[in-house]
Design a protein with these regions (language model features):
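N-terminal intrinsically disordered/low-complexity leader segments
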Residues: 1-19, 162
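Helix-turn-helix
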Residues: 2, 23, 27, 31-65, ...
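Hydrophobic alpha-helical connector segments
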Residues: 69, 83-113, 165-172
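Short, basic, alpha-helical segments at the C-terminal edge of helix-turn-helix-like DNA-binding modules
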Residues: 72-78
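Amphipathic alpha-helical packing segments from all-alpha helical-bundle domains
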Residues: 79, 129-156, 167, 194
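Amphipathic alpha-helical segments used for helix-helix packing
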Residues: 95, 109-130
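Amphipathic C-terminal alpha-helical segment
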Residues: 105-108, 152, 172-189, 202-206
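Hydrophobic alpha-helical segments that form the core
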Residues: 4, 113-119, 163-182, 194-202
Length: 206
């Protein structure tokens, strides 16, 4: 795998020092995930990434651009279970994979607690409205994909005829967002797992 590097400008004479862009971006992701977009200061980011502010701007653009790159990384590496869940053979399997995938991510000791998207959309103020809207649009796209999968399941007879596919997509979204908030507040894995199990007992169809 090719590792992308960038050069840090230094105030002293001599050869500029290179840094790994991927590692710096992963460090930035952890800061945003822990503190939210507005809570993450440039000092927090540059310290965690091990680079100077000019080097951050040169490699990633401004703070907003850095956050969007970190969010892309988050979706690729942390929230990839969402795409895999839609390939489950049944709608119940989709729900199970989505909720347990979220549970695993929210409670993994290597990750900050909760969901980056939920943390950011809740914590952003008026000055970061563009970031909030971008995060909400990604969430809406995920919900649309879920709704399309459930509509197909209904056509295939996987649900009772009177099932509200849109309501189920909203229900799953609310459960996962609720787990994120509870994980951020210190809920244990056992407590969240009980929520998942109860939700699956309420699930219609097979």
């Amino acid at each position: 795998m090719e590792i992308e590097t960038a050069t840090i400008a230094t105030p002293h004479k001599g050869r500029p020092r290179e840094f790994c862009v991927d590692m710096a971006l992963a460090a930035a992701l952890r800061v945003f995930w822990s503190k939210g977009y507005e809570g993450a200061s440039m000092a927090d980011l540059t310290e965690a990434m091990g680079i100077t502010k000019p080097s951050l701007y040169a490699a990633f653009g401004n703070k907003e651009a850095l956050f969007n790159k970190a969010l892309d990384l988050y979706e690729r590496e942390k929230a990839d279970y969402m795409h895999a869940a839609l390939d489950a053979p049944t709608a119940r399997g989709v729900a199970e994979r989505l909720m347990y995938g979220a549970l695993d991510m929210y409670t993994c000791p290597e990750n900050p607690n909760g969901c980056l998207g939920v943390i950011t959309s809740v914590a952003c103020g008026a000055e970061a409205e563009c970031i909030r809207q971008a995060v909400l649009e990604r969430g809406a796209a995920a919900k649309r994909a879920m709704l399309a999968r459930f509509a197909r399941a209904k056509e295939e007879g996987d649900f009772p005829p009177d099932t509200d596919a849109e309501g189920l997509a909203a229900f799953l979204t609310a459960v996962n967002q609720g787990m994120s908030v509870q994980a951020g507040a210190g809920a244990t894995r056992a407590e969240l797992e009980r929520l998942v199990e109860t939700s699956l007992k309420l699930w219609p169809g097979r």
